[in-house]
């Protein structure tokens, strides 16, 4: 099955490209605001499911508008739609760290992570889509992408920070790197200087647990051949 990565993250694209996986990219936009008292697991599962739903709607809109020329090679067989979301979780197991809204928000998160260990969670959903007759229009031969199978995984990695000073936080924010990253840091960039130890998947902290994602894709492909 061909693969569509529904993500605007350049880091996820880079990780999949490293293993020479062929895939098409689309970007989706959803509201990523956590609900009040929503647990980290409930939040991250909701995010990847919402991204998959938004991507499916987008693919069907392009199909209806005959604007799917870049996906023509995908129209004759099922596809795997990959969606992913990464968050930080404080030691209390309840506080979700998403992308900082501004400098003050970033400082607040970093102060909570300073000289301590937090977790980075990434959820990945593989959704198998197949072209099926539109249920409400069975006599016009119109087809739409419909979900026929989906699986999720959640990977957790422990990350320990050094003690952070105000100068370190100020310099890092001014670098421009933190703004689009969960927890406000990038372990693959300047943020690596803050990390004294990790326990678990490094690529999970970057934004996609690579080995686990490839295993999920293989499992989905194997299921399709049964």
UniProtKB/Swiss-Prot annotation:
Coiled coil: none
Keyword annotations: Cytoplasm, Hydrolase, Nucleotide metabolism
Alphabetical list of InterPro entries matching this protein: ITPase-like_fam (IPR029001), Maf-like (IPR003697)
Site (Important for substrate specificity): 11, 86, 188
Record's subcellular location: Cytoplasm
Keyword Protein transport in record: no
Protein EC: 3.6.1.9
Protein family according to the UniProt entry: Belongs to the Maf family. YhdE subfamily.
Free-text function comment from the UniProt entry: Nucleoside triphosphate pyrophosphatase that hydrolyzes dTTP and UTP. May have a dual role in cell division arrest and in preventing the incorporation of modified nucleotides into cellular nucleic acids.
A biological process from GO: nucleotide metabolic process
Protein name: dTTP/UTP pyrophosphatase
Active site residues of this protein: 85
Cofactor(s) the record lists: a divalent metal cation
Pfam families: Maf
Molecular functions (GO terms): dTTP diphosphatase activity; UTP diphosphatase activity
Enzyme class: hydrolase
Record-level GO cellular component terms: cytoplasm
UniProt keyword Hydrolase, yes or no: yes
Catalysed conversion reaction: dTTP + H2O = dTMP + diphosphate + H(+); UTP + H2O = UMP + diphosphate + H(+)
């Amino acid at each position: 099955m061909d693969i569509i990565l529904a993500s605007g993250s350049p880091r996820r694209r880079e990780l999949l490209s490293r293993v020479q996986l062929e895939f098409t990219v689309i970007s989706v936009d959803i509201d990523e605001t956590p609900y009040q008292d929503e647990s980290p697991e409930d939040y991250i599962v909701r995010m990847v499911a919402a991204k998959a739903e938004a991507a499916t709607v987008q693919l069907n809109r392009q199909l209806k508008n005959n604007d799917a020329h870049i996906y023509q090679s995908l129209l004759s067989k099922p596809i795997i739609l990959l969606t992913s979301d990464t968050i930080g979780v404080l030691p209390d197991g309840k506080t979700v760290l998403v992308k900082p809204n501004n400098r003050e928000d970033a400082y607040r998160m970093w102060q909570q992570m300073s000289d301590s260990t937090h977790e980075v969670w990434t959820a990945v959903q593989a959704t198998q889509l197949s072209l099926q007759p539109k249920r409400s229009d069975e006599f016009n031969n119109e087809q739409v992408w419909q979900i026929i199978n989906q699986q999720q995984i959640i990977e957790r990695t422990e990350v320990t920070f050094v003690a952070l000073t105000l100068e370190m936080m100020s310099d890092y924010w001014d670098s421009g790197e933190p703004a689009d990253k969960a927890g406000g840091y990038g372990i693959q960039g300047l943020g690596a200087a803050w990390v004294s130890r990790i326990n678990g998947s490094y690529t999970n902290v970057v934004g996609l647990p690579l080995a686990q994602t490839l295993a999920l894709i293989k499992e989905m492909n194997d299921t399709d051949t049964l």
